[in-house]
Regions:
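Intrinsically disordered, low-complexity segments enriched in serine and arginine
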Residues: 8-12
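Conserved hydrophobic core element of enzyme catalytic domains
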Residues: 269-375
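Contiguous alpha-helical scaffold segments within structured protein domains
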Residues: 82-118, 124, 148, 202-302, ...
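An N-terminal, globular interaction/scaffold subdomain
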Residues: 18-88
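Conserved hydrophobic/aromatic pocket- or pore-lining residues that grip, position, or stack substrates
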Residues: 134, 192, 232
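Short, conserved loop-to-beta-strand elements that form functional interface hotspots
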Residues: 59, 171-176, 314-315
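An anion-binding catalytic pocket shared by soluble metabolic enzymes
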Residues: 19-32, 36, 150-229, 322-345
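Intrinsically disordered, low-complexity linker/loop segments enriched in Gly/Pro
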Residues: 88-181, 187, 204-208
Length: 375
C-alpha cells in the first residue's frame, strides 16, 4: 500500500476502536467514499418505509427487530482526516486526537460455534421437504461460521483496501456503529440505485465457479430456474406499483472467483419520496429469501437455526436529491474483537442436492476468507 493508504488504515482502525459511526465504501469503477457522524448518534429505524426522504448511509438487517434495527449514519464529515494528530469533533463540543486514544473493544458475545456440515445437512433436510411438497417454490438456506482471530494486529481497513483491489466488480464496504459493530463485505447485488427519476435493480441468482478465470457459458436448468424466480418477483413488484421496467436477458457476471446470472431492470420512479415503499416491496428478494415471500420469510426465521443479523439485509448510500446506491449485504463478515463471523447462503429448489449446496456456501465464504488469511 502507499503511504497515504497506510495512514488511512491507521485512522480508520482507530475510529473502530473509538466506537465511531462511519462508513467507507467503493462502488465498482469509482473511488472509495467516506462518511462519518460525529454529532449525536446514528438514527435507529424500525420500518423500511421510514427511509423515505432520509439521507445518509443505511445498514438494514434481514429482519428488523429491537436487536437489529435499521441504522442510518447521518454524516457531518465526508473526508477522512489524514493529518497526524488531527482533532475530530465529538458530541458535546469535545474533541479527541486520533492517535492518542486507548483501545476499547466492542463488547460482543462470540458465538460458541459456527454451523458445521452436519447441522447444515439437518437444516437442508427441513428446507427441502416443503419444497418437494410444493408448499414453497424456492427457499434460501444460509449459515454462519465463526473463525477465531489468529492475530491481534488484524486491520479491517487494510482488509478493505485488499478487497477493493481483489474484487473490482463488487461493491466493497467497511462500516462501524455502536449498534451494529464492524462489518466488511464485497457484494455483487444491487437492490436499488439511481437518481432523478431513473432507477435500476437486478435479479441476480444462480452460482458457478469461474472456468479457468473466465465466465462459464453453460448453465444448468436449476441455476436458470433459480434466477428466473428472482426476475419474476421483481417484475411483479414493479408492476404492482404501475412501473413498466426495461429488462435485459440473463447473462453471467463475475463476483470474485464465482459467477452468477443477472438480469438488469431499468425504470422511472417519478415520486422519489416513495423509495421506502419500493424497498419494502423488494426486500427481501427471492435471492436471499424465497417464494412466496411472506411465507418463506417466516419459515426461514423459524427454521434456519440462527440469526442472520445484517447479513442479507441491504446497505449503502441514500440522498433524497442525489444518487442512491443500495446493495444486498452478501459475501460479508461481522468483525468482532477476537473472531470473525462469516455468512453465506444459497437458493434451494426441489431438485437441489445437499452436497452441492454445501459446497456453494463454502465457495462463497472464500470471498471473506481470502481477506482473513492474508494476515
Amino acid at each position: 500500500m502507499t503511504p497515504d493508504e497506510l495512514r488511512a488504515c491507521e485512522v480508520i482502525d482507530a475510529l473502530i476502536r473509538q466506537n465511531r459511526s462511519f462508513a467507507l465504501w467503493r462502488i465498482p469503477g469509482e473511488s472509495p467514499r467516506f462518511a462519518m457522524q460525529t454529532s449525536g448518534f446514528a438514527r435507529l429505524l424500525y420500518n423500511i418505509e421510514e427511509l423515505d426522504g432520509q439521507s445518509g448511509f443505511v445498514i438494514a438487517p434481514f429482519h428488523v427487530s429491537e436487536q437489529h434495527p435499521i441504522v442510518l449514519i447521518r454524516p457531518d464529515i465526508r473526508e477522512l482526516p489524514l493529518d497526524k494528530g488531527e482533532d475530530v469533533p465529538c458530541s458535546g463540543n469535545k474533541s479527541f486526537t486520533l492517535m492518542e486514544q486507548k483501545f476499547h473493544a466492542r463488547e460482543t458475545k462470540v458465538p460458541c460455534k459456527g454451523n458445521l456440515k452436519e447441522d447444515y445437512n439437518r437444516r437442508f433436510n427441513s428446507f427441502i421437504e416443503p419444497l418437494r411438497r410444493k408448499q414453497f417454490e424456492k427457499l434460501v438456506l444460509s449459515r454462519s461460521q465463526t473463525i477465531p482471530a489468529g492475530k491481534a494486529d488484524f486491520s479491517p481497513a487494510a482488509a478493505f483496501h485488499k478487497a477493493i483491489r481483489r474484487y473490482k466488480y463488487s461493491y466493497v464496504y467497511l462500516c462501524h456503529t455502536p449498534a451494529t459493530g464492524t462489518w466488511l463485505g464485497c457484494t455483487p447485488e444491487i437492490i436499488l440505485s439511481g437518481e432523478k427519476g431513473e432507477w435500476h435493480t437486478v435479479a441476480l441468482a444462480g452460482t458457478q465457479p469461474l472456468q479457468n478465470g473466465e465466465l462459464p457459458t453453460e448453465w444448468d436448468d436449476k441455476n436458470r430456474e433459480e434466477q428466473e424466480y428472482v426476475a419474476f418477483y421483481i417484475r411483479k413488484q414493479l408492476q404492482a406499483l404501475g412501473i413498466k421496467p426495461t429488462e435485459t436477458a440473463p447473462a453471467p457476471v463475475r463476483a470474485g472467483e464465482l459467477s452468477h446470472l443477472k438480469s438488469d431492470f431499468s425504470f422511472p420512479l417519478p415520486d422519489n419520496k416513495k423509495l421506502g415503499d419500493l424497498l419494502e416491496r423488494l426486500h427481501p428478494t427471492p435471492a436471499v429469501c424465497g417464494l412466496p415471500k411472506e411465507e418463506t420469510y417466516r419459515f426461514i426465521r423459524e427454521n434456519e437455526g440462527y440469526d442472520r443479523s445484517y447479513y442479507s439485509g441491504f446497505i449503502g448510500w441514500l440522498a433524497p436529491e442525489g444518487k442512491r446506491d443500495l446493495y444486498v449485504n452478501l459475501r460479508c463478515m461481522n468483525i468482532l474483537a477476537d473472531a470473525f463471523v462469516l455468512y453465506a447462503g444459497g437458493g434451494i429448489l426441489a431438485s437441489s442436492e445437499t452436497e452441492s449446496e454445501w459446497l456453494e456456501t463454502e465457495a462463497k465464504m472464500q470471498t471473506m476468507m481470502h481477506l482473513i488469511l492474508d494476515f
